[in-house]
């Protein structure tokens, strides 16, 4: 029960000082209560509690719109200074109060107690005089004074980078954001500040001194045996005086006047017997948070204790204490803000005062009688001292006494107002929260908003099912971090997918050919196609030419087989056929009709050329149809003419044989002198050549026969149709003639006379038939007559026409050739002549018997065999172009 008495006693004194009830007669008593509440401070200023560090110093973390000098002045007003950081451990402890740290946050700077003394620009020190530890780093390029007047002499701490920076001491934030700063106070200064500013702790000390717990003895009136219960009864009688409160308009009183008024009020109060001197009520300063526990003082010695305790009296005291506690709870409701309160007492009537005094005296007398049997004051003090002994009170329940908070200190002593005004104030009163609570509420709402924005469907269920013992705020923060992590993972996946797509696109671009490469490839392919087409065309032309040449070769072979020996005429025919083939090859090879397909605008040219070719084909088809009809008509006419001319030709042959017999008789005389035989075959289409003569008077006679009218018509038609002529030429052969003695000539003549009963002239006629080809050819028949005569005028040539053959005039030149010239000509021919057939056997005319070629039967004209249909070059190129376009066209995009 003793601890309950002590607790009630402390609460009673606290309530009395808070209410400040005074008793006065006539004068008004004025009591000024501090109105500088935390809510009335600057809206940009945030304060905190004093936090004790592991090394004993106390720190307060603040924020406001101020520069470095203003921050230091504020710390000095609190009996502190800006924080100094001595090592990395202190830095870590300070930065732990600015968690969380992240490079994603905006830059946070803290004003600390670092400065450069006047005149020293490179030696920075802390405000307590210590030098900077080398383990603390500066930001890059700092410290460096960027101002022209040397104003950057104060230090800052970068929270995120953990480095130091310099700043102008008088500069503030341009965007008026809250500037952070830290105040540092030693433990000794903190205790001193708490004693001077916290009046509650001063009253507690007075309370301890009242009970004799203190260093200096307090005067004690031992003659009056009144205990604490009597004093309480006296206070109750004085508290029954009704009091009213009125507001005063005077706001110009100084602190000295207020102290005088307070001292008068306290003097008017009834003094407690046995207590120490009353302490004056000071003007309340700005609350400084929680204080330190005051040291326990020695207990003063008192008189002897009285044995025995009245339990009924203790029960009454406990009941009264409970009632007082209830009244104190009613008074702790925060009243409206009042700058000044005036307490006035109303003087009661004298009768009532007299009655009260009588009742008081009776009570006092009764108590004096009962107190003789109660404990002595010394025993009571010893019992109280035992209560404070920790060893004795170890097992007893304890009541913790906590100092009031800043809000309670500011609001205490405000008093109560009058009836009507109190009701208005209570209706208009609003609950004000401490800045720490506001920050927590804001933080909670911000985290809740982030959680609702970023959380998924299952996050709320996880949050409710979480039984880890963490607070709701921490669980929501963890959920937000998890959502952020998911978003970062999704962003990384998207970035990786984009990178992979870009790489695929780059590879596709690299694989695709550029337009220039496509053009080059198209040119190469088209050139290869053109070459292949030309080779194909040449091969087709070679096949046709080979067929024509084989026909000519077969005809010549048949003639050679029918004869006993080969003649120069057959060789020339075969040679002319081969030369005609070579000329056709050259013409076909030089055809560069499709050379312009390699241009850039090849597609347009191909289309235009196809249109022209279609027109030409239509016109050529019409011409071919008309040409074929004309050819059929001409063939019919030729067959009719041949049948009509055959009897005439036979008559002419008979006449020619008669003439030849006459000529042979005249040649026998000439053989005795000279024997010359020259056979020359030359092809001259429309002109006569002069014969060559070296030292001889032999003349050459030429007989030209014009082409038939039918051949001229055929040539004109073929030229109009645009076909090329394929002409065959025969080279002339010269035979050297030797001078033979007369005796040998006679012998030869005798031998010939024996062999031939009838002298005949040796004639050699070569017939050349025209083969039916796409281009018109001129068939020539060369005849060589060996006419040894004494006179050049007697030289003659005979021509015979066979059906479907044409003969050309052949000039025979007779001259004397020396053996040396003949040898030279033979060597020259051997070097220049190209052998198209196996080498022919050499022979000499004198050793051969004269012979005549039999008349060859007329051969039917062979119809041209239709060549197989070959695709044109335009068709081949068109198909190839279509295929190349498909190959060179860009690939279709893949379906996404």
Curated annotation (Swiss-Prot):
Regions of compositional bias (Acidic residues) in chain numbering: 250-260, 407-426
Bias (Low complexity): 727-739, 773-809
One Gene Ontology MF term: carbohydrate binding
Residues passing through the membrane, by range: none
Domain of life of the native organism: Eukaryota
Biological classification of the source: Eukaryota, Metazoa, Ecdysozoa, Nematoda, Chromadorea
SMART domains registered for this protein in UniProt: CLECT
Cited PANTHER family: C-TYPE LECTIN DOMAIN-CONTAINING PROTEIN 180
Disulfide bonds: 154-169
C-type lectin domain location: 54-178
Origin species: Caenorhabditis elegans
Location relative to the cell: Secreted
Gene Ontology CC annotations of this record: extracellular region
Protein name from the UniProt record: C-type lectin domain-containing protein 180
Keywords linked to the UniProt accession: Disulfide bond, Glycoprotein, Lectin, Secreted, Signal
Primary localisation category: secreted
Ranges where the record places region Disordered: 243-264, 354-436, 492-519, 557-809
Compositional bias segments (type: Basic and acidic residues): 354-382, 395-406, 427-436, 575-590, 607-663, 683-692, 740-768
InterPro entries tied to this protein: C-type_lectin-like (IPR001304), C-type_lectin-like/link_sf (IPR016186), C-type_lectin/matrix_domain (IPR050828), CTDL_fold (IPR016187)
Signal peptide annotation: 1-18
Glycan-bearing residues: 133, 221, 235
